[in-house]
């Protein structure tokens, strides 16, 4: 819409300094869908809070963060604010993975000019749709006196209401006036009220206040000498954590009236958020991140080797695991550890072809029998196919993924100049992958790392590189026995059981969830705190909602320290905006 005129109307927001000044927080939410649902009585809230046999250790919490919202969070923001009928386009390239999570990478990421260009294209498209004839009557709360002229009052009403959700806090009078002025100037020039409003809205959608979460601290009245997140920052941190999107109007109201800063108020809010249908999207986002499912974006198999493995298979494999996670952890409120031994899952026609099962239309629940080698997430296509090569399986990649993704145990990279030709050649003199790995391990330089990964990965040789079950490799029996940190097993089901009982499995999840919720990687100083959350997790039967509640209700979740260099980081983050504005003003 009127793209040639945009240079006359700067679309960049009013300055990153205002985000620090007013404490830009959390992320958006339901402009069209207000409120939460869930338990409301004090008895239910008290019951949900759950008493513990352990006391939370003293902690200064995490540093107040400045971080870029992820692509998915940005699109969720727009979707929850303007409704499902707005076409949001596709996700942007992911951020860098840091300590196991893309979300952690957001705490260290800035935005480049190229990324800003992507945001701008999405913002322009969304803003144009919001004001078009199909949407304006139910998204814009007023009508201009004339569609061919500026109406500052109507523009201000809409931009103030939308801006509260987009910026995750109320706009100042100055910000409202600046946005309305921008809309009015553009409308007068273009002789089109809605075109001017779209330009002002587009500026909001790519402003630093929208794209960056800048957490603000305030003195903690309950702990003299310590600081806590201010109310709007806490609302945002909770909303990103549990919903992977920003606070809706009800949550912002709870921040405005101070309820969110009281123990009873926060307990009520957390329980309502955990009972909301929006929790599913938040849990999906976390496990999609933890399981490194962004690897699906580049997953491809050799069609000559795996002709039944298609692009539909790729999408459905990801969806199968996420459906299994939601069903087990949220619907059934099951033990997290049992995800790795469960026989219950869901199948689509494309997956049925790889699982070698009869296909039924659409998605259907499926229960593998007790004598099946399919037990838990390790035996699903999402794990087996992603952690393989395009034309063959890889015990090393699978064992490495098990260690790093599920047990939080980093595996060192291979030393330089290692000859992998032996294990990469399926046509060598060695009959099976185990034989090839054993021969490769005769090189002492290689043995150290492979002993960390391959005893588990070789058990998964029961499945080929696409995830299909097999008992032989080129006519030779496959030996699926192995060990996991001293626990011996005879087959892949035994591996699943050994993983299920490994003490690092729940503790790894705890560390990942706390990092995800606090907006950045944990530190060695968090050791006692993580131990406390582990105990709470165990006491509550390893239920995932219980873990989310324990973290969200902790003092550490809201306690913050003021990091050094925040102003410098803010200035660096703002630099691309200044350059972008200069380029578009020419």
Question: Model-derived features: where do they sit?
Answer:
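C-terminal motif of bacterial Sec signal peptides marking the signal peptidase cleavage site
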Residues: 33-35
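N-terminal secretory signal peptides that target proteins for export/translocation
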Residues: 1-18
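Mature N-terminal segment immediately following signal peptide/propeptide cleavage
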Residues: 60-90
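Sec-dependent signal peptide hydrophobic core
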Residues: 20-27
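Active-site substrate-binding loop specific to GH73 endo-beta-N-acetylglucosaminidase modules
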Residues: 37, 52-53, 79-517, 526-544, ...
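Bacterial Sec signal peptide processing site at the extreme N-terminus
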Residues: 38-49
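Surface-exposed beta-strand-to-loop junctions
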Residues: 55-57
């Amino acid at each position: 819409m009127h793209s040639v005129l945009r240079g006359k109307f700067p679309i960049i927001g009013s300055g990153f300094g205002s985000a620090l000044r007013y404490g830009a927080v959390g992320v958006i939410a339901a402009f069209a869908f207000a409120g939460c649902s869930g338990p409301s009585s004090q008895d239910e809230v008290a019951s949900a809070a759950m008493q513990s046999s352990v006391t939370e250790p003293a902690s200064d919490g995490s540093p107040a963060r400045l971080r870029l919202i992820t692509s998915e969070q940005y699109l969720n923001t727009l979707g929850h604010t303007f409704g499902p009928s707005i076409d949001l386009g596709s996700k942007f390239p992911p951020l860098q993975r840091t300590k196991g999570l893309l979300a952690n990478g957001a705490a260290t990421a800035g935005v480049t000019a190229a990324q800003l260009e992507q945001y701008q294209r999405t913002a322009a498209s969304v803003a144009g749709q919001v004001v078009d004839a199909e949407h304006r009557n139910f998204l814009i709360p007023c009508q201009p006196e004339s569609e061919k002229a500026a109406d500052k009052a109507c523009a201000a009403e809409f931009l103030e209401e939308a801006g509260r959700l987009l910026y995750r806090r109320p706009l100042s009078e100055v910000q409202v006036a600046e946005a309305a002025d921008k809309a009015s100037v553009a409308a007068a020039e273009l002789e089109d009220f809605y075109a001017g409003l779209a330009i002002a809205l587009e500026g909001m959608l790519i402003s630093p206040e929208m794209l960056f979460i800048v957490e603000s601290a305030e003195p903690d009245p309950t702990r003299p000498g310590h600081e806590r997140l201010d109310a709007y920052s806490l609302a945002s941190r909770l909303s990103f954590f549990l919903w992977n999107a920003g606070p809706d109007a009800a949550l912002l109201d709870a921040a405005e009236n101070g309820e969110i800063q009281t123990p009873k108020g926060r307990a009520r809010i957390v329980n309502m958020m955990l009972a909301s249908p929006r929790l599913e999207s938040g849990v999906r986002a976390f496990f999609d991140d933890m399981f490194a499912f962004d690897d699906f974006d580049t997953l491809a198999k050799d069609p000559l080797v795996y002709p039944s493995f298609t692009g539909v298979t790729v999408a459905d494999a990801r969806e199968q695991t996420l459906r299994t996670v939601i069903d087990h952890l949220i619907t059934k409120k099951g033990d997290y550890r049992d995800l790795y031994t469960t026989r219950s899952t869901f199948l689509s026609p494309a997956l049925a072809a790889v699982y070698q099962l009869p296909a039924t239309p659409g998605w259907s629940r499926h229960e593998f029998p007790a004598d099946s080698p399919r037990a838990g997430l390790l035996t699903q296509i999402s794990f087996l196919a992603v952690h393989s090569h395009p034309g063959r399986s890889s015990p090393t990649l699978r064992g490495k993924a098990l260690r790093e993704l599920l047990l939080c145990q980093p595996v060192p990279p291979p030393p330089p100049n290692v000859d992998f030709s032996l294990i990469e050649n399926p046509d060598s003199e060695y009959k099976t992958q185990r034989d090839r790995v054993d021969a490769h391990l005769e090189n002492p330089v290689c043995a150290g790392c492979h002993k960390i990964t391959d005893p588990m990965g070789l058990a998964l040789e029961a499945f080929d590189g696409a995830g299909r079950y097999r008992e032989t490799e080129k006519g030779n029996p496959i030996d699926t026995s192995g060990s996991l940190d001293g626990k011996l097993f005879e087959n892949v089901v035994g591996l699943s059981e050994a993983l299920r009982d490994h003490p690092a499995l729940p503790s790894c999840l705890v560390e990942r969830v706390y990092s995800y919720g606090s907006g950045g990687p944990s530190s060695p100083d968090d050791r006692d705190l993580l131990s406390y959350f582990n105990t709470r997790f165990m006491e509550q039967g390893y239920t995932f909602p219980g873990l989310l509640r324990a973290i969200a209700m902790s003092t550490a979740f809201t306690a913050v320290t003021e990091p050094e260099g925040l102003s410098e980081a803010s200035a660096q983050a703002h630099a691309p905006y200044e350059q972008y504005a200069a380029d578009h003003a020419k």
